[in-house]
UniProtKB/Swiss-Prot annotation:
Originating species: Drosophila heteroneura
Name this polypeptide is given: Alcohol dehydrogenase
Catalytic activity: a primary alcohol + NAD(+) = an aldehyde + NADH + H(+); a secondary alcohol + NAD(+) = a ketone + NADH + H(+)
Lineage, top ranks: Eukaryota, Metazoa, Ecdysozoa, Arthropoda, Hexapoda
Tree of life domain: Eukaryota
Positions annotated to bind NAD(+): 10-33
A single GO BP: alcohol metabolic process
Amino acid sequence: MVIANSNIIFVAGLGGIGLDTSREIVKSGPKNLVVLDRIDNPAAIAELKALNPKVTITFYPYDVTVPLAETKKLLKTIFDKLKTVDLLINGAGILDDTQIERTIAVNFTGTVNTTTAIMDFWDKRKGGPGGVVANICSVTGFNSIYQVPVYSASKAAALSFTTSLAKLAHITGVTVYSINPGITKTVLVHKFNSWLNVEPRVAELLLEHPTQTTLQCAQNFVKAIEANQNGAIWKLDLGRLDAIEWTKHWDSGI
């Protein structure tokens, strides 16, 4: 996918990985970048606008845990304004295994609902033009961090949802792939709670392992966007971008 002159919606585009990715996207010259985030950050929006004045940056407050109908209403507002959208990035995520329901709601259900909502505008069975969805999942969807089983399970669920949608591309006309960062130096991983406090030092122990910067992750994220490979399971770890070959142990045969 060519980012230049495209219209992009980025859910949670002002967070750690999100903000650096927004910066890299803006440098590539899209026509519009629409940022949906729970928390407004006027300074970050101003920075993005200054980075490339030719790009129109728009912000809408959005909590991914709202009902599906509210998400559809917001997307209708955006589509009415832009007419077309080329790429949806689902990037909302929390890491706190003491908040079980919210972890699942943000990391999994929010991704499902936002993706489902945009199908009203993209699905070729409804006369839509198709589009592209990039879901930010996690390497914990491959192998869990067992001290945070709720977080790991939510990301595994998001990954499974994403790979399923990719197999429906011939029906919907929508390309779908996953972005799976490894341990990245963000606020998210500097302090978080394990499930039932099984490991009070989990964040500290995790950061003893090799990490990557948010900039390294963002630069590889843009490469994955440009590759635009339906069904790709991208691992973004230690400053590298690698396509993961999923081992199949069972097949529905459908």
